């Protein structure tokens, strides 16, 4: 687990920090028109020409305005993209070069209100997040390979989303994108067509589907009519040749219908590019709703195995996210993916002696103590 934000100490700032998004660099990268924040190391504290300097200590002489980094951000490295508060007193890591997973928040608004949502919706104007996302994309190093676009529900801001995707196409055409959406806006054939016409080379939309029928799905997402719109959205995207991933969060309501949902997908949506069966992150709305959603993963292994076998037999690529190998049926290990983002990923003390630790995805630090009671080290 790593910290992604911390308090900085401004040194010699002439005023407010502008712009608010910077790429961290070192001596191998010469100053350009891009906002580059030079990460000062021992012996190179007099490199001139950069708009901002990042230091590890208070007594470093630099030829320009500087921010002294907190100890929690000592992991910053060249290529990372950071956000800096206008007064220079807070730094947030927005994209990390060494991270396995990077994602950009586009909005906290949503037209679903899922019982287990890890990012509870907020009804406020956050259109500035799309502008920041464009700045982040513009600063990504050429070594960047993938980026997640998440919310909230990004498609609520249709024009801003299309504009961002066009910016990605024109600025980082090699980048693999993964857009999280509830899929409902894609039921509008006109919007689905606009999305497809952007012409991105490598983008997938991850869309949740929680039941094989409207009643339960709409209850889980707390939005009447959502099931029909989501399914029509998936169909529209597929008809336009767009990549779609169906995401199923395995929780107390979905476990009893998991095999039926797998059959529904196998029979009606077998063309999707991937299905992700996802362990529950016990944060956000999942905490106050824990009695409604929590189930120990050890108690649904039969259903998870049956659902996986149904999907695989139908030729649907299947992945299992956010599960620990010691809890999974060993027949499911080939489908398990290390999927938890670095900043909220950790291992328990008992994991240190586990023979498969390096292949295991670990646990959510955000889930607190709400973890399976069957976690254990696997002997050699």
What are these regions (language model features)?
Residues 192-210, 262-277, 336-361:
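Structural recognition of alpha->loop->beta junctions
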Residues 1-100, 303-304, 310-318:
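Flexible, acidic/Gly-rich N-terminal and inter-domain linker regions that tether
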Residues 147, 202-206, 228-291, 299-323:
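Conserved C-terminal portion of the radical SAM core fold
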Residues 2-15, 329-380:
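Flexible mid-to-C-terminal extensions adjoining Fe-S/redox cofactors in radical SAM and related proteins
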Residues 159-166, 187-197, 256-264:
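Distinct, well-ordered alpha-helical segments
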